[in-house]
Amino acid sequence: ERNHYHTPNDSPANLDPRTVQHHGDNLFPLALWLANSDLSAAHTGRVVYAGVYGLWAQWPQSATAILLGVAALLLIAAGLRWEAGAAMLVLHATLVPGLLLALGGLLVHQCFELLERTNGVTVGWPAHPWTFRIVIWSAMLLPALVLGPLFQQRVPFGARLLGAWWFLWLLSFGVFLFAPDAAPALLIAVLPTALLLAVLAWLPLPPAWRDLLSSLTLAASALFLYAATLLGATQGLHVLPAIWPWVGLFAVTAVAFVRGPGSGLAALVGILVLPLGMLLSINLPLYSEQRPQHLSVWYLQEADAPAARLHLQAAGDLPPTMAGMSGFTDRRENLFPWSDEPRPHQAEAVSAELPAPSLLVEEDRPVAGGRRLRLRLRSERDAAMLRLVLPAAAGDWTGDVEGVPINRGPVDGSETQEFTQLRVHGVQGRDVRITLEVESTGPLTAWLADYSHTLPAIAEGLRMARPATAVPQHWGDTAVVYREVTF
């Protein structure tokens, strides 16, 4: 559960070997493969890899082009014996898959836009993820279920089946050209399917038996559903554009099997299941103790200011226990003078009068192109981190921290490029000596802030009001004291 990442739930008790950090789905089969391998054998060269139903598959990167060629030859061999027709084959290898993916993708995004408007947020890891999976899967499969009978009446089964896998081969080839290391994600399904279709085409089987055994190709394309499920679990539903195409690829391969008297019933079921998934996604709770809302309490204090501010950094609407607390509004304002990302859920508070961080200029002398500054920084409240935010006038500065060379780096993406920052972690009560060479010859006005994870008493009520279905994330609960400095 990556919902637990950087939260109090990020513990061994919640460890799942399938989703360790971001690539646990590959880590577990890799560990099994290594345990059964001869590790004394030398290995050179780049390899590409993929997890296949819990098994580890890898081959030299240079072999991908050969495997693509083998898959193409097998599909050609299958087409020689399978009734298809060149025109219909081309149609089902290009236009039909594109139509199914476009219709399904449009439907998915429209459904999730409606859900976001109703729920107020798209939750990456909701309490009941299966309801949202119902929406994604049914929306992507619905065009295939509705249009499948229409294709059956006009296009031979062989053209529908081979066309779908030629589309996947073309897609694999395109991925190989632009991102060769990503091609195995498709090739692990295309190659065994091409082999199966070629074998079925050349075996002396009755057409009915051949068509029946061809349904085994769905076992290969089901790998795409596996990929969609893993992406939703490890990256969250907010990466929706990376999830639904995998379900769409399964739909492209499955449309050939939408036929017979039951196809109309299947389409009707799909039409009914989609609104059912929508209703469940709207009415069931978005958060639970196992999959909580990410909500951190921030205390912000500008030195010598008459009042401080409280900020609730939350994904989505505030919990009822906190939404009614006085002073918080949905009006968006910048958190800091140097930031340029207005955020809601802020309120004025009585200042706890925490001591501000200190800065002492130990040296200030001119150098070629600017000035050399030696600064001594300190958190007067033993905070964990110091941040020095420099204005654009400092130019492309360089320097060192305790003798370690540093270069100018950009501030967070949430802050304007008019400022650059220097963050020093693990400070606590120590003096930090910084040497900077700036391009400015005149006075510089900067900001100095320190960050701790101990909230003052003024914020204790908010922390206590946070329900069990909400937890702090990333920085967690944070107290920031900042001041303007000139040197």
List each language-model region with its residue ranges.
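Soluble extramembrane regions of membrane proteins in the secretory/endomembrane system
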Residues: 1-58, 388, 392, 404, ...
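Short, surface-exposed, charge-dense and proline/glycine-enriched linear segments
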Residues: 4-10, 28-30, 34, 66-81, ...
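Sequence-level detector for tyrosine residue identity
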Residues: 5, 49, 53-56, 226, ...
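Generic structural signal for short, solvent-exposed loop/turn connectors between secondary structure elements
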Residues: 38-43, 81-86, 258-262, 368, ...
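Structured alpha-helical bundle/scaffold domains in large eukaryotic membrane-trafficking regulators
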Residues: 42-43, 64, 119
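Hydrophobic transmembrane alpha-helical segments in integral membrane proteins
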Residues: 57-70, 133
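Alpha-helical transmembrane segments of integral membrane proteins
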Residues: 69-359
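Extracytosolic and intramembrane catalytic regions of membrane-associated proteins
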Residues: 298-487
